């Protein structure tokens, strides 16, 4: 996937230029699949496939999400809505959960305006390469960087796990989020 294509897609969807492009990797796991949430040992690594996001700030409080991998419309909600509801477009809940939980932090008031976000993955959904964790870590990284949040990578990983467990309602350990957020080239996590 190339940056120019992503920026072009963003422009076509939102009618304006995107500001920044982000990437969050997926992960493989050599041993220990389905054992991390039972306290077992795992051996994951980040990979070169993942989820890309093009961010653009807004002057209002609307968050507008669009996935290049799912047929459908723009998902839109207001940051000022105290109870962000789960969406019937399941993929959007990973973004909504991270936004909700980061806004609840002490410095969450820094997330003080809306944004447009175009996402596209080269990870096959349901392939076991942690597309959901990559989405969560992408959203966390974007909010951290664009709103100057004081949150470290392990805390973002835990926020992603909380999103998956509590907001989305899936049972997961912390392995996927840690591998996607802390992993880097040529290093096993």
Predicted regions mapped to residue ranges:
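ATP-binding N-lobe of GHMP and related small-molecule kinases
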Residues: 1-129, 133, 140-153, 158-168, ...
């Amino acid at each position: 996937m190339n940056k120019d294509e992503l920026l072009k897609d963003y422009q076509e969807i939102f009618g304006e230029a995107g500001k920044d492009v982000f990437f969050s990797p997926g992960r493989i796991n050599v041993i220990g699949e389905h054992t991390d949430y039972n306290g077992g040992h795992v051996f994951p690594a980040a990979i070169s496939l993942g989820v890309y996001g093009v961010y653009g700030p807004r002057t209002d409080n609307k968050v507008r999400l669009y996935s290049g991998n799912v047929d459908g419309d723009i998902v839109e909600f207001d940051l000022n809505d105290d109870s962000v509801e789960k969406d019937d477009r399941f993929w959007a809940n990973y973004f909504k959960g991270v936004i909700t939980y980061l806004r609840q932090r002490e410095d969450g008031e820094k997330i003080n305006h809306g944004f447009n976000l175009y996402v596209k993955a080269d990870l096959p959904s349901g392939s076991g390469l942690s597309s959901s964790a990559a989405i969560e870590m992408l959203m966390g990284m974007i909010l951290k960087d664009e709103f100057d949040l004081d949150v470290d990578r392990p805390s973002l990983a835990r926020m992603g796990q909380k999103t998956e467990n509590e907001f989305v309602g899936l049972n997961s350990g912390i392995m996927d989020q840690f591998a996607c957020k802390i992993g880097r080239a040529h290093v096993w996590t």
